Each structure stands twice: as structure tokens, then as C-alpha cells.
């Protein structure tokens, strides 16, 4: 009599948004995937759904897993992430061998800086949101020994805020420093961090081309064939510049190395 083979790996996706939905198939190829979410919406195809609200202790135990990706939205208080992660750890039978916690470059706030920010720079958060993000990072490291990923300006199909802004002709601060990463490259980054033997402990997920917002909206406007949005002039440009050397050394060439390739593909896709 032959028993069914045990799965080679078990992956838990905490917060099942678009990123998790794109990652699930990669890990279903050689194991089971669990998708924990607060709502009762269906999990990614093939994944096992778990409905739970991490704002409170979980009523049932979670399955043992080998790896875990945490992509949770900001909470209402600076302690929301720590609370959620504490409840998550209490419901797991053991700490996973690998945890990746998705934070944001939003841990850096304030007036901004033209000097490239690397993973060695320490955030000095001033807002409730940025303080909550930083405390979430610290909790993820303390509780799960997690790798921290800080994406900047995630964009791609379905993430079209800037395209809508340009189409509507809404004024923007042209001199503002901006950074971004295409969703496809972020998914690649997260998959590699979940799989590689010795991942970096902290990673800024940004593309190769930090740029003034005016350059980006001008490119988009020309691709769309519309007027460039008006400028909101400012005495001191805001925003930061993030150094993406580490993520590029890990991934090699990005699928969308700059905003030009990314937005051109989005515009071409929407016109098809």
C-alpha cells in the first residue's frame, strides 16, 4: 500500500494581496502553500486559505511551515505590526526557518535627502506610520529573525495611480525625488529571498533609476499623448534617493530596470 508523499515544503503567505497571489504558484510547484488573510475572499489558486485577524490572538493553531512571507498593511497604531506578529508567533507550532517581512522605504520620512540612502543608513521616523513600520521591522527580527525588505513605489498592472494622475492633469511637484520598483521585480526579489541559503538581512527593493517626479510624468505624458501635468514648485524638493546596488547584485538585470520600461509596458498593455 502506497501512502501519499509528504510535500517537500510548506509556505505561509501572511496577507494575501497581489504579491502573495503571484508568489503562490512558484511554491506550489514543490509543496503546499497556505494563505492567511483577514477577509473571506478566496485564496490564490491552489493555496489553502486560512481566515484570521491578527489583531487578536488566533483561536486555532496554524500549520508548521518552512518559510513565511509577511505582507501586512499598516495598522491604526504604531504597535499594530508588533501585535500582529506576536499573535502570529503564538499560533505557529515553531518559528519558520525563513521569514521575509515586507516593510517600506517609508521608514525614512521628513524633508528628504539627495544623498543616496543605503541599507546601512538608520531611519529616524517622525510620523505614526513610519514609527509603526520601523517597530514592525524590529519585531519581525526579534520574533522571527526575519529578513526585511523595503520596497519603494510599487507599480505595475493594477497599480496605476501615476498613470491616472497624468491622464487627469493633476499638478505634481516636479522636483520631488522618487524611487520605485515594478511589481514583477519585487516578486522576483521576494522569491529569491525566500529560497536562497543566506539572504541579506535588509534590502531596499528599488530599480536602477531614482528620478525627479517631473521626469517620470513627462515620460508618461509623452507616451500617452497628453499634456505634462503642471508643476507644484517648491523651494526645497522633498523625497529621498535610495541606492539599489544590493538588490541588483542579487537579481542581476531587472525585468524593468527603470520607469521607462515599466510604464511603457503598462501603457502598451492598456492599449492592447
Regions inferred by a protein language model and the residue ranges of each:
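N-terminal Rossmann-fold NAD(P) dinucleotide-binding loop
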Residues: 20-21
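NAD(P)-cofactor binding segment of oxidoreductase domains
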Residues: 61-101, 135
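Conserved Rossmann-fold NAD(P)-dependent oxidoreductase catalytic core, especially the SDR/UDP-sugar
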Residues: 87-126
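Flexible, glycine-rich beta-alpha linker
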Residues: 149-164
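Mid/C-terminal beta-alpha module of Rossmann-like enzyme folds, strongest
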Residues: 189-237
Amino acid at each position: 500500500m502506497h501512502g501519499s508523499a509528504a510535500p517537500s515544503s510548506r509556505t505561509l503567505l501572511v496577507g494575501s494581496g497581489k504579491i502573495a497571489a503571484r508568489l503562490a504558484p512558484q511554491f506550489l510547484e514543490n509543496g503546499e502553500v497556505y494563505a492567511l488573510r483577514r477577509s473571506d475572499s478566496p485564496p490564490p489558486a491552489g493555496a489553502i486559505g486560512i481566515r484570521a485577524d491578527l489583531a487578536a490572538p488566533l483561536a486555532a493553531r496554524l500549520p508548521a511551515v518552512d518559510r513565511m512571507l509577511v505582507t501586512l498593511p499598516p495598522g491604526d497604531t504604531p504597535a499594530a505590526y508588533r501585535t500582529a506578529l506576536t499573535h502570529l508567533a503564538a499560533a505557529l507550532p515553531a518559528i519558520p526557518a525563513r521569514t521575509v517581512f515586507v516593510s517600506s522605504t517609508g521608514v525614512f520620512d521628513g524633508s528628504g535627502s539627495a544623498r543616496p540612502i543605503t541599507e546601512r543608513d538608520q531611519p529616524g521616523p517622525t510620523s505614526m506610520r513610519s514609527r509603526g513600520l520601523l517597530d514592525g521591522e524590529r519585531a519581525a527580527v526579534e520574533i522571527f529573525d526575519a529578513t526585511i525588505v523595503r520596497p519603494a513605489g510599487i507599480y505595475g498592472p493594477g497599480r496605476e495611480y501615476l498613470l491616472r494622475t497624468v491622464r487627469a492633469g493633476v499638478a505634481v511637484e516636479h522636483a520631488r525625488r522618487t524611487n520605485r520598483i515594478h511589481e514583477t521585480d519585487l516578486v522576483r526579489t521576494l522569491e529569491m529571498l525566500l529560497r536562497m541559503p543566506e539572504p541579506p538581512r535588509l534590502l531596499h527593493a528599488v530599480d536602477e533609476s531614482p528620478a525627479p517626479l517631473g521626469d517620470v510624468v513627462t515620460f508618461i505624458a509623452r507616451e500617452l499623448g497628453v499634456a505634462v501635468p503642471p508643476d507644484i514648485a517648491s523651494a526645497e524638493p522633498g523625497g529621498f534617493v535610495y541606492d539599489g546596488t544590493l538588490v541588483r547584485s542579487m537579481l542581476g538585470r531587472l525585468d524593468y530596470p527603470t520607469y521607462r520600461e515599466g510604464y511603457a509596458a503598462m501603457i502598451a498593455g492598456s492599449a492592447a
